Amino acid sequence: MSRYRGPRFKKIRRLGALPGLTSKRPRSGSDFKNQSRFGKKSQYRIRLEEKQKLRFHYGLTEQQLLRYVHIAGKAKGSTDQVLLQLLEMRLDNILFRLGMASTIPAARQLVNHRHILVNGRIVDIPSYRCKPRDIITSKDKQRSKVLIQNSIESSPHEELPKHLTIDSFQYKGLVNQIIDSKLIGLKINELLVVEYYSRQT
């Protein structure tokens, strides 16, 4: 299944706020209306919707998300928490969290078009897994700097996650540590996502 490129508001109206996909928010009460219209949700549908939330927020294909679930399942620790850490440490998501891109699809474009350096080298792979002490900067070209500057200036200035630091004057971000999955703050039950895939096998 390919990455979703359809109407974004349609997705947030059904699934709720997905800040990685779009800065728009669903109207208050829309979740209740949807639930009333479709009746009581089955356990399968609840797990499916949590999986869809995670997939659309991070802008992944079905295959990509399944691969991350498999990697998390083989790692030490709780599968659901490792899964979130893997997704949060992707370069496209780090750019979004730093405010250097307004959404994860916008961050992916910056990376694909070679505007981003990690530790002084161009990285054009959005799924690149960032590590502690990685330094993320824009390429030393006017167009690259303008794109980053516009995003930083228009970002909602929410409190930066503790695992990241940004110098907005030098267009430079620093990864301080691997994120604690408990501090991610998404309204997604990642355990239900893992359960969804475990029941598919």
From Swiss-Prot:
Domain called S4 RNA-binding: residue spans: 89-150
Assembly information from the UniProt record: Part of the 30S ribosomal subunit. Contacts protein S5. The interaction surface between S4 and S5 is involved in control of translational fidelity.
Function: One of the primary rRNA binding proteins, it binds directly to 16S rRNA where it nucleates assembly of the body of the 30S subunit.
Alphabetized UniProt keyword annotations: Chloroplast, Plastid, Ribonucleoprotein, Ribosomal protein, RNA-binding, rRNA-binding
PANTHER family assigned: 30S 40S RIBOSOMAL PROTEIN (PTHR11831), SMALL RIBOSOMAL SUBUNIT PROTEIN US4M (PTHR11831:SF4)
Keyword ATP-binding in record: no
KW RNA-binding (keyword) present: yes
UniProt main location, coarse: plastid
Annotated protein name in UniProt: Small ribosomal subunit protein uS4c
Pfam hit, one: Ribosomal_S4
UniProt family annotation: Belongs to the universal ribosomal protein uS4 family.
Organism: Dioscorea elephantipes (Elephant's foot yam)
Domain of life, per lineage: Eukaryota
A Gene Ontology biological process term: translation
Subcellular compartments: Plastid, Chloroplast
InterPro entries: Ribosomal_uS4, Ribosomal_uS4_bac-type, Ribosomal_uS4_CS, Ribosomal_uS4_N, S4_RNA-bd, S4_RNA-bd_sf
Gene Ontology CC entries for this record: chloroplast; small ribosomal subunit
GO molecular function: rRNA binding; structural constituent of ribosome
